[in-house]
Amino acid sequence: GVSLANAAYQQALAYAKDRKQGPPLTDFNAASVPIIQHPDVRRNLMLMKAFAEGTRALTAKAAYHADVSMHAEPGPEKEKSQDALDLMVPIVKAYSTDKGFKVCELAIQVFGGYGYCSEYPVEQYMRDCKISSVYEGTNGIQAMDLVGRKMRQKGGALFMGYVQELA
């Protein structure tokens, strides 16, 4: 989800800067402008960027906890990182794959009809991204694991600690 979201965003951004279609809203008699100047395209691109960067940040945080849990000396820091990682895995997996798919969908929207054609990579990105929400336990199964098991670990203290960290 993370890599495809970022790739889809970069492709859509480049296309929106290059593709000219329609005049600006401020002057309907003007020549066609790059579609990045149209409000709906800009809104889609901003949403795509936010989701792409959000998935990257969340994944980086999980990677940090993975590194600490694997390489720190045994002790509280290592245990805390392992606990955080255990809790974050289903969250990162579901969020990244769901938002990655949404970014790919929005990229197709930015491309318009061309986005649905195989000549442009966003069509393939969307198909590739969808399978990531199914592999390694569907996102629904991951959610059940989070709610049914991981949020209850250590009497719920692990989850509440994570919530406090986010606040």
Model-derived segments and spans:
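Flavin-dependent oxidoreductase catalytic core characteristic
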Residues: 1-167
